[in-house]
Design a protein with these regions (language model features):
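Short amphipathic alpha-helical/adjacent loop interface patches that line ligand
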Residues: 2, 116-119, 148, 159
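C-terminal helical "tail/cap" subdomain of flavin- and related membrane-associated enzymes
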Residues: 66, 124-170
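Short beta->alpha junction loops/turns
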Residues: 12, 46, 109-112, 147
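Conserved FAD-binding catalytic core of PHBH/FMO-like flavoproteins
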Residues: 1-76
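FAD/FMN-dependent oxidoreductases across multiple families
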Residues: 49-138
Length: 170
């Protein structure tokens, strides 16, 4: 139901050390600092908003931007947002990871946080297997799936529910 419009802005130097997310009637607008001079913008716009052109996205950004001055915009990239959680985390000895494992709305970067948590669990499982002198095989993948699947399902559905609350028109 949403499209993420992403672009980079170059701007006058600012103390750019905090991410910011604004919830607009069109969808969440995230400011993700890259340096004192650059910021990544992710604007997840509801399809009901009928915002389609790059110029409309730039105009909306300008409306909500209160921080950055003398802006130069990069080209906008568009990504259709979808919600998917894999039923099976591995096949043979191939493990799905990151967005191939769980695609959720980029609300406050929670998909990335889920991937970092998954990575920590995988690393801990690898260390445990190596400490026992065992070889890494399909059992590792099965254990990883067992430890992460229910949490990922619950967490991703919670993010999906929270995101849907922001779409409610009052």
């Amino acid at each position: 139901n949403s499209t993420a419009f992403t672009f980079i802005i170059n701007h006058e130097p600012v103390n750019n050390n905090k991410s910011l997310q604004i919830f607009t009637k069109h969808g969440p607008l995230a400011f993700l600092p890259l340096s004192k001079f650059q910021t990544s913008i992710v604007f997840s716009i509801n399809k009901k908003s009928f915002i389609r052109s790059d110029s409309e996205v730039y105009d909306l950004f300008k409306k909500y931007n209160k921080i950055y001055k003398k802006i130069k915009f990069s080209k906008i990239e568009k990504v259709e947002l979808k919600f998917e959680v894999a039923r099976h985390y591995y096949h043979d000895e191939i493990l799905l990871f990151g967005d191939s494992l769980h695609q959720i709305h980029p609300l406050a970067g929670q998909g990335f946080n889920m991937t970092i948590r998954d990575l920590q669990i995988l690393i801990n499982e690898i260390i445990k297997i190596k400490d026992l002198g065992l070889t890494i095989n399909k059992n590792l993948l099965k254990e990883f799936q067992t430890k992460t699947k229910s949490y990922n399902f619950l967490y991703s559905n919670s993010i999906n529910l929270i995101e849907s609350f922001f779409k409610i028109d009052n």
